[in-house]
């Protein structure tokens, strides 16, 4: 299945940086790349442990109604450098037209420097269902009941 996502580059964005793309035929996530403003392209962006930084992609997108774009971490960056998204998955709504930035943090012990053009996250397009929330006097009973975190055990 294919869906068209309109992409607009920011006026300052480097056109040599590829638009989001899928690395393999079966990939669910399209790679997003750092597209840094001209004044910091040479030095990159350093993220200190436990700090948060919004890394620009230089893009704006138009997601079709009925869909969202989920921004997810890249597993290799998480494993090798402790780089993750504190709000994973980040949600880009279909009516948002602002700059697409990726909120990143380092959960490791060493700073990470991201360079212009680095793959920094993945974008997954997913359908959206808007529910109707209805007040009720009671909820139907289930076998699980009110058991919350860890209540279903291990294994």
From Swiss-Prot:
Reaction catalysis annotation: dUTP + H2O = dUMP + diphosphate + H(+)
Pathway: Pyrimidine metabolism; dUMP biosynthesis; dUMP from dCTP (dUTP route): step 2/2
EC id: 3.6.1.23
Keyword Iron recorded: no
Residues annotated for substrate binding in this entry: 74-76, 87, 91-93
Single GO term (MF): dUTP diphosphatase activity
Keywords from the UniProt entry: Hydrolase, Magnesium, Metal-binding, Nucleotide metabolism
Function summary: This enzyme is involved in nucleotide metabolism: it produces dUMP, the immediate precursor of thymidine nucleotides and it decreases the intracellular concentration of dUTP so that uracil cannot be incorporated into DNA.
Protein name, as recorded: Deoxyuridine 5'-triphosphate nucleotidohydrolase
């Amino acid at each position: 299945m294919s869906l068209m996502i309109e992409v607009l580059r920011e006026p300052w964005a480097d056109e040599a940086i590829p638009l989001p793309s899928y690395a393999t035929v079966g990939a669910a996530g399209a790679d997003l790349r750092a597209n840094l403003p001209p004044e910091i392209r040479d030095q990159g962006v350093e993220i200190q442990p436990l700090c948060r930084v919004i890394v620009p992609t230089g893009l704006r997108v138009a997601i079709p109604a009925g869909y969202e774009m989920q921004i997810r971490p890249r597993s290799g960056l998480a494993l090798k450098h402790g780089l993750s998204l504190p709000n994973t998955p980040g949600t880009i709504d279909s009516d948002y037209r602002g700059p697409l930035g990726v909120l990143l943090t380092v959960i490791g012990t060493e700073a990470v420097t991201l360079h212009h053009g680095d793959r920094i996250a993945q974008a997954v397009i997913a359908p959206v269902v808007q529910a109707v929330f209805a007040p009720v006097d009671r909820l139907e009973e289930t076998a699980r009941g009110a058991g919350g975190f860890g209540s279903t055990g291990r294994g």
